[in-house]
């Protein structure tokens, strides 16, 4: 059996008939984005004095998230950045930290009242390193949020979903996927490609039941590719000293060898 099938029972798992959950999401801070009443505007910044290597990842994120803009951190505090962002009508901030010239942390906050999520970042593959990668265009992508099955997972997934338009432009055939598996969130960006299935030499052309030529669907990865793991979720914006934590990962409480317990 896989670890997914041996997963410990969790009382916070979502149920299809849970009216309380559906009532909550209709009134939460992300609801206006899902009702297309509000569009995200995202700022990306870094730690002070970032290395040049993190800028390749930033460029990829600018193509992944619509209406996303990079601002140099300089010497500003996070509190000053939040105040500036609110004045400029930003709805989200992404802050990237790094170690040994590799991005290793990502903080995502929703303005003006949170929540704020802190992720460990691993396995970054920039677009330029993906064989046969495509280039994203200006069409608004679809967003797929997969396997966020607990109340915490729903909250994390809705935070990601609020960063995208919910009126995707299907003509662009672009899809941003956030797939949760065992509390690791795999982020991918693809384009669908449709091709008529050609007949082999001396063979009859393949047709569907409607008499039309069969069409094959393939995907082209646009990049970037990376993995996130949630470290904590806070109710407000950037206050690790006095802020209220909705959830925090504590290794000694969860158990180092507890491989069957997942939280998203």
Task: Enumerate the language-model features and the residues they cover.
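Phospho-regulatory, Ser/Thr- and acidic-rich intrinsically disordered linkers and terminal tails
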Residues: 1-264
């Amino acid at each position: 059996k896989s670890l997914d099938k041996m997963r410990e029972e969790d009382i916070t798992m979502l149920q299809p008939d849970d009216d309380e959950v559906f009532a909550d999401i209709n009134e939460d801070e992300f609801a206006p984005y899902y009702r297309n009443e509000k569009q995200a505007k995202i700022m990306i910044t870094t730690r002070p004095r970032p290395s040049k290597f993190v800028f390749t990842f930033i460029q990829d994120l600018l193509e992944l998230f619509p209406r996303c803009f990079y601002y140099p951190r300089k010497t500003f505090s996070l509190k000053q950045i939040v105040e500036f962002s609110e004045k400029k009508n930003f709805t989200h901030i992404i802050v990237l930290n790094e170690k040994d010239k590799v991005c290793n942390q990502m903080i995502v906050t929703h303005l003006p009242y949170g929540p704020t999520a802190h992720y460990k970042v691993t396995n970054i593959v920039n677009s330029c390193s993906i064989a046969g990668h495509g280039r994203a265009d200006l069409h608004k992508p679809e967003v797929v949020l997969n396997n966020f099955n607990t109340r915490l997972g729903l909250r994390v997934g809705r935070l990601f979903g609020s960063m995208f338009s919910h009126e995707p432009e299907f003509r662009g055939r672009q899809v941003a996927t956030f797939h949760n598996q065992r509390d690791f969130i795999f982020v991918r960006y693809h384009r669908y490609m449709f091709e008529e299935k050609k007949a082999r030499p001396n063979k009859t052309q393949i047709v569907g039941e409607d008499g039309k030529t069969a069409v094959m669907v393939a995907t082209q990865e646009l990049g970037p590719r990376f993995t996130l793991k949630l470290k904590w979720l806070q109710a407000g914006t950037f206050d690790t000293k006095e802020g209220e934590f909705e959830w925090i990962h504590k290794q000694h409480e969860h158990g180092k060898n507890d491989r069957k317990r997942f939280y998203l």
